[in-house]
Amino acid sequence: MSLCTLEINLSAIKNNYRLLQDICKTALVGAVVKANGYGLGAMQIAKALIKENCQYFFVATSEEGINLRKVLNNDITILVLNGVFTHDALELIQYNLTPVLNNLSQIEIWQKFSNLKGKILPCYLHFNTGLNRFGLNSDEIEQLINDRDLLKGLDLQYIISHLAASEETGNPYNLIQLNRFKVYLEYFPNVKASFANSGGIFLGQDYHFDLARPGAALYGLNSLIEVSSNLSYTEEFESNTAALTTTACINKCPDVSVRLTPKLPLKGSYTVRLQNPVTLKAPIIDLQNLTLDSHIGYNMTFTTKRDSVIATLPLGYADGFSRNFSSQGEVFINSCSVPIVGRVSMDLINIDVTDLPPSEVFLGQEAEIIGNYCTPDKIASIIGTIGYEVLTSLGSRYKRKYIS
């Protein structure tokens, strides 16, 4: 096991969940725990959030759902976002997992197994409103509207869609997607809806519908957020929506001639701060006293400009610590910034502790890699990625410690 410790503060995650519940006054709030809870532990997070009355958990694959079901009672809903495939349909039924059906092929598969088992099977439908990554397209939705037998044997519980730019509060595409979604829902008046991811929650109540699906916000990503109590745009519509024939409505909906003027700061907005639940610490395992012009690490990419004290920490790119941190980035020792020097190798990194008091530099001294001084979002900005990737890349070798 690694000498590094990854601390996950479940209380912080629960606090973030409660904050999201407060914002979503008229909607339920689920939790996205795919990719092992963004690398932090899906089972532990789910068990903690159940205590906050969370009843809906979203995973990506059937395997993730099965692992989660082993620790959650059958009355808790587990949604599989990637849907159903022939090879795993029976497992979804066995473990009481609900697929999010993303195309007509998946609907046909789920209906086939409904007939095979002689029972009505639950499902969600995913409508593509503009992310264009997954989900039923307008032609497929039209087929469902015109032939309801395509859903025979299925218990359609929710219709969902996914925002493409929800973290950009002034992006007019959010409202374009919202209006597409609303038009589609007109044809399914008795079905509940889910639209808001983390960013969508902060766009305002119009985006909340019946169930919100936060992931990143639970884990403290994009932590300082402006929340709108209403839409973040002035709107002018020129749309002939009186004729709600399926083809006309669906085909025109994406281009309803919406003219949007972003309003920033948001009208009726307020600011909230999410808590970072993640701390990664690594001990100093070696110290080198080097003279001027000494080379450090592979390919001698860093050369000391003075007599230096260089410490070694036991983590590297095999643990998800990107090589892009080579000779850039920082760690913290007793709240003091310490630069990373030389190449990040598979299992080790070097830091320059020359400027620290000698009393703070010793074998076993802990350096904070991720924490309140250097959050996942800050780390991401240094290496040109996003906080999601930082968290989901956290290696399996870290000793995980859960704080309740």
From Swiss-Prot:
UniProt-listed GO biological process terms: D-alanine biosynthetic process
Domain RPE1 insert: 226-273
Active site (UniProt): 34, 298
This enzyme's EC code(s): 5.1.1.1
Key words of the record: Isomerase, Pyridoxal phosphate
SUPFAM superfamilies: Alanine racemase C-terminal domain-like, PLP-binding barrel
UniProt catalytic activity: L-alanine = D-alanine
CDD domains associated with the record: PLPDE_III_AR (cd00430)
Entry GO MF terms: alanine racemase activity; pyridoxal phosphate binding
Alphabetized SMART domains for the sequence: Ala_racemase_C
InterPro entries found in the cross-reference section: Ala_racemase (IPR000821), Ala_racemase/Decarboxylase_C (IPR009006), Ala_racemase_C (IPR011079), Ala_racemase_N (IPR001608), Ala_racemase_pyridoxalP-BS (IPR020622), PLP-binding_barrel (IPR029066), RPE1 (IPR005728)
Residues found modified as N6-(pyridoxal phosphate)lysine: 34
Sections of the chain in a coiled coil: none
Family: Belongs to the alanine racemase family.
Protein name: Alanine racemase
Upper lineage: Bacteria, Pseudomonadati, Pseudomonadota, Alphaproteobacteria, Rickettsiales
